[in-house]
Curated annotation (Swiss-Prot):
InterPro entries: Ribosomal_bL27. The keyword Lipid biosynthesis does not apply. SUPFAM superfamilies: Ribosomal L27 protein-like. Pfam families: Ribosomal_L27. This is Large ribosomal subunit protein bL27. Residues 1-25 are annotated as: Disordered. HAMAP family: Ribosomal_bL27. The lineage of its organism: Bacteria, Pseudomonadati, Thermodesulfobacteriota, Desulfobacteria, Desulfobacterales. One of its GO terms (biological process) is translation. Belongs to the bacterial ribosomal protein bL27 family. GO terms for molecular function: structural constituent of ribosome. It comes from the Bacteria. Keywords: Ribonucleoprotein, Ribosomal protein. The gene is rpmA.
Length: 84
């Protein structure tokens, strides 16, 4: 004979994995072609010279060189890669 009332089941207990977004290479760092510079949602940072953008807005280097973050007007930022 049970002396404890059955406990209800909870609907919590899940947590999704982190998506690991953010800047991967900072200004002044040297990169090789294909290196990921920024993982982002939307164009928080725009691609500059020698930088490509993937379909998920990932910015990557097209050449070997040095990373430089620049302002594009008053409210936009962009990242470029210049030959070392």
């Amino acid at each position: 004979m049970s002396h404890k009332k059955a406990g209800g089941s909870t609907r919590n207990g899940r947590d999704s994995n982190a998506q690991r977004r953010g800047v991967k290479k900072f200004g002044g760092q040297t990169v090789v072609a294909g290196n990921i510079l920024v993982r982002q949602l939307g164009t928080k940072i725009h691609p500059g010279s020698n930088v490509g953008m993937g379909k998920d807005y990932t910015l990557f280097s097209k050449i070997d060189g040095v990373v430089a973050y620049e302002r594009k007007g008053r409210d936009k930022k962009r990242v470029s890669v210049y030959e070392a």
